[in-house]
Regions:
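Hydrophobic helix-and-loop "lid/oligomerization" segment in the mid-to-C-terminal part
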Residues: 4, 11-142, 162-163, 213-434, ...
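Mid-to-C-terminal polyanion-binding domains and interfaces
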Residues: 77-83, 314-320, 324-358, 411-577
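Short, glycine-/Ser/Thr-/acidic-enriched flexible segments
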Residues: 92, 149-151, 173, 189-190, ...
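Conserved strand-to-helix beginnings and helix N-cap segments that scaffold or border functional pockets
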Residues: 99-100, 128-129, 156, 178, ...
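Short alpha-helices
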Residues: 101, 179-218, 223-235
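Conserved beta-strand segments of alpha/beta enzyme cores
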Residues: 112-114, 165, 183, 528
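Conserved acidic residues
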Residues: 141, 182, 548
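Histidine/acidic-residue-rich, glycine-tolerant segments that coordinate divalent metal ions
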Residues: 146-199
Length: 577
């Protein structure tokens, strides 16, 4: 079931070209790159300077966030009264990094503090009664909850009845009613005028610590060692890498590369990233999944134990343990994705639906989110994957670009026990017997609201260029666009009418990739490229006919100072069709 990509490219107008020429001249970068800046809404010299040199001094004043003053006052009171504090968080990467960040920072000034990660299988998502009862037993008076809690109205009220206060730091969509916490920090609150809405949970935790430090005269420099955790959470939680997130991610990657905290250093070593320049995609594909794996397979607590560890040899053995979980997770994940694919291909009816809803009572709760993501990547449909939990079905929804899956799920709220999340990813719980009813309603909502182009495999091309445009300077300037992520994706270029230099060949264990050496008609430069999983195009390439390619420009790991094109799609040249 191969989706053919549609290429979406809008050439710049004459006016846009002229503006790009002028901006490029001012910044001493090529007009092509100036054009990319303008597509990202950066049109002035000063905006470009802020983009290329993100400054920690430009972080937003944390006290602009609603309830921040209340949160800082309550934390100060707890310390003054020597109350026991519990830092509580979700079991995913964002939750674990957030808990590690807040715990590590407060612990430098105050010792009566511990952390708690609920068990995905036993307690489920968010605030659990079990967690609150544990806090009561342990004599906790204040719970700081991170990356969840925005809907925990009953649980927070229950804690309050036991004399336990809550500070909520969350970034999921709030309902009309907020929990009765001392402070609810969430930039997505309808009544919050905080200028940046896309922080992740760890980001909200960082803002809380920034405010606490500011209020207590603690120098900002003490917060810098926490930025590596922010970068990991921003990449792994797939939030827009713009504005404040760009500043945090930029300086967080710097910390991750120059002096990572001990726990992260152990993970970097285990992933084989030591000595490499770590990027956002290394976090997404290597570091993040390992931190996630302990929460998916066993308990997220082990990840936090690792992230706050101070002794490197202990950290290394914990990282090895978590790596084993990740291997188990990969096996289960692969098996479940194959099963899900088989179901989709058997259910011809779902082939033509604009969404997919699948369920199986034997699927592992910790991995269904990944399976839902895989299915959206394969079929380009909003997808819900459910598994059984007693009389209930719990599951994950993932979306395609531009479609709000949270609203689709919200439209079924009368048959849901629970739901929460974001535009592109959400979680839900319903009665097992209601699955068919849910599927009908969900699919009807998607049918009525989705745009046809949202279910097509689209490649959004940033610029059309010739090989002679790819100079050393252009490549080094291009790297300054990083860190990449949603809303600042790695620029995708296309070049038309290229030819095989005669030396391209199929490679890989199963001969599935093509290693290319290419030329175009404008210059004699031979350019190296790799096309993963595209060996089906090899016959055409070797037929001496011309073709068009869409690609990103990468470092060539084997030849220093050389570039390599990572080719996303190959298609016969227009005139040959």
């Amino acid at each position: 079931y191969i989706m053919l990509f549609k290429w979406n490219y809008k050439p710049p107008t004459k006016e846009e070209k002229q503006a790009a020429d002028e901006l490029g001249a001012k910044l001493n970068i090529s007009p092509i790159l100036a054009q990319l800046l303008m597509q990202r809404g950066i049109t002035t010299e000063s905006a470009a300077k802020r983009f290329f040199h993100p400054q920690l001094a430009d972080l937003i004043n944390p006290f602009l966030m609603k309830d921040m003053d209340l949160a800082v006052d309550r934390l100060n009171d707890a310390m003054g009264r020597k109350e026991r504090i519990l830092v509580y968080g979700d079991y995913d990467v964002d939750g674990c990094t957030a808990v590690a960040l807040v715990y590590k920072f407060i612990q430098q000034f105050y010792s009566n503090i511990e952390y708690y990660i609920p068990d995905r299988y036993d307690e489920g998502y968010g605030v659990s009664k079990k967690g609150i009862d544990y806090a009561k037993e342990a004599g906790v008076k204040l719970i700081i909850i991170l990356d969840c809690g925005i809907k925990a109205v009953e649980e927070v009220a229950y804690a309050k009845s036991l004399g336990i206060d809550f500070i909520i730091c969350d970034h999921h969509m709030p309902d009309e009613e907020l929990p009765p916490a001392v402070a609810v920090l969430n930039p997505k609150r309808a009544d919050d005028s905080y200028p940046f809405k896309h922080l992740c949970g760890c980001g909200v935790g960082f803002k809380f610590m920034q405010a606490f430090a500011k209020n207590n005269g603690i120098p900002f420099a003490r917060l810098i060692p926490l930025l590596d955790l922010c970068a990991v959470s921003i990449a792994a939680d797939i939030v827009p890498v713009v504005d404040e997130n760009r500043i945090l991610a930029f300086h967080g990657l710097k910390a991750l590369n120059q002096n990572p905290s001990i726990g992260l250093k152990a993970i970097i070593d285990i992933c084989g990233l030591g000595g490499r320049d770590i990027t956002m995609s290394d976090i997404v594909f290597k570091i993040g999944p390992r931190i996630n794996a302990s929460g998916r397979m066993e308990s997220g607590r082990e990840s936090v134990d690792l992230l706050v560890e101070r002794d490197f040899s202990h950290a290394l053995s914990k990282a090895k343990h978590i790596d084993c979980y990740n291997e188990q997770r990969k096996d289960i994940d692969k098996q479940m994705t194959e099963e899900a694919n088989n179901i989709v291909s058997r259910l011809e009816s779902q082939r033509h639906q604009s969404s997919i809803v699948l369920y199986d009572e034997n699927w592992k709760k910790g991995v269904i989110g990944i399976v839902a993501s895989r299915l959206t990547e394969i079929y380009f449909r909003p997808t819900v994957v459910l598994t059984r939990d007693g009389d209930f079905a719990t599951g994950s929804a993932r979306s395609v670009t531009g479609f709000d899956v949270y609203s689709a799920i919200k439209s079924c709220r009368d048959m849901l026990v629970n739901f929460g999340g974001h535009t592109y990813a959400a979680g839900l719980t319903l009665r097992w017997d209601d699955i068919q009813k849910f599927r009908k309603r969900f699919q009807k909502y998607v049918d009525e609201h989705i745009q046809p182009e949202q279910t097509e495999a689209m490649l959004n091309i940033d610029a059309e260029i010739d090989f002679r445009d790819i100079t050393k300077k252009m490549h080094s300037d291009l790297k300054r666009f990083a860190p990449f992520g949603p809303c600042n994706t790695k620029p995708l270029f296309c070049t038309t009418g290229v030819y095989d230099y005669g030396t391209s060949k199929v490679v890989g264990r199963e001969q599935e990739h093509i290693k290319l050496e290419l030329v175009d008609s404008k210059s004699s430069n031979v350019v190296n490229g790799i096309a993963f999983g595209q060996s089906a195009s090899a016959r055409y390439i070797k037929s001496k006919r011309s073709f068009d390619i869409a690609y990103t420009i990468e470092d060539n790991i084997f030849k220093r100072n050389m570039v390599q094109l990572q080719i996303e799609d190959i298609r016969p040249a227009e005139e040959d069709e």
